[in-house]
């Protein structure tokens, strides 16, 4: 009986030692490598991509025959839409300001007559206006990728007249300006029974 208890104790001890040995042999899990913070260029480029997606999708959602829609003729009681831009003019205006702001960063001149920020009056077709818009965002991505920690607050000639503005202002204001007019375009779409693409998953 005494021998049986001794053998049981030895077996238990061997099992414990084996388990400890296996645990000791198992390699330690390496600590996760800290993720490098994004560059300023990457942050700005991401913001450009966000407004580009929302704005271009909204522009493409409006049918050709309604591209020059403005609410001036709706005769909504209590409303005053006199002088507001048409849908097409909203798109051209934002694209033009994009060219002005991002061109200030890259040194590129606007590809067409900016017409005081309203874009070329001769450009009237949906296809041409949407291409003009997409080209402006292509310049935006190029401008974003040129911004560094060293030059982000560096000054460039203001496209709005005399004086200078920083590259950071060009980047942030171009995005804010786009979303400002995007809100107007969303209303125009809904006035025509069109759900904005960004809202279609929520309806």
Residue ranges: model-predicted function:
Residues 1-10:
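Bacterial N-terminal signal peptides that target proteins for export
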Residues 47, 120-158, 166-181:
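Acidic/histidine-rich alpha-helical segments that form the ligand environment
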Residues 19-23:
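Boundary at the C-terminal end of the N-terminal hydrophobic targeting segment
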Residues 60-69, 143-153, 190-197:
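Surface-exposed helix-capping loop/turn segments at secondary-structure junctions
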Residues 45, 49-56, 68-117, 157-203:
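Short, contiguous alpha-helical
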Residues 50, 54-57, 61, 139-146, ...:
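Solvent-exposed, charged/polar functional surfaces in cytosolic regulatory/catalytic domains
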